[in-house]
């Protein structure tokens, strides 16, 4: 029922119900997409994140979107790549699962994901794309939510396009 769209762009400009933040466990901002989302949302996001007491790897928490076009930010903590034998695939799939679960529980109809864990956490992009698409596809097959994967570059987008 839902559909997946893959695009290149700035996730902070997504005009849907929610964007997903690839956060660190503190939820207090950082580099990459995490820093960009915190900067674009404004200081209120950090204030709300301080009340959440962090987030374990593979899990997700929701906040308001504040100055973002999206109404909500769903923060998820992706795994750091340590060779693939330390539960990384399951933890990455859990990021997508728990984020979508929160969105569906809230009745959201559109959500945008970044490429979780593929930056400084060094998750191999081809494997991350495969896990993302399989997990998302399984969940939205019979649910009315549209998912956009917002890639950082055309090269990143290719990893998702070739998985289709």
Curated annotation (Swiss-Prot):
It holds the Pfam family Macro. PROSITE patterns: MACRO. Gene3D superfamilies: Leucine Aminopeptidase, subunit E, domain 1 (3.40.220.10). Disruption phenotype: Increased sensitivity to hydrogen peroxide. No reduction in growth rate. No reduction in the ability to accumulate haem on cell surface. No change in Rgp and Kgp proteolytic activity. Signal peptide: none annotated. Residues 1-164 form the Macro domain. It comes from the Bacteria. Induction: Very low background expression levels, induced by oxidative stress due to hydrogen peroxide. InterPro entries: Macro_dom, Macro_dom-like. The grpE-dnaJ-PG1777-PG1778-PG1779 genes are co-transcribed and may form an operon. Belongs to the MacroD-type family. This is Macro domain-containing protein PG1779.
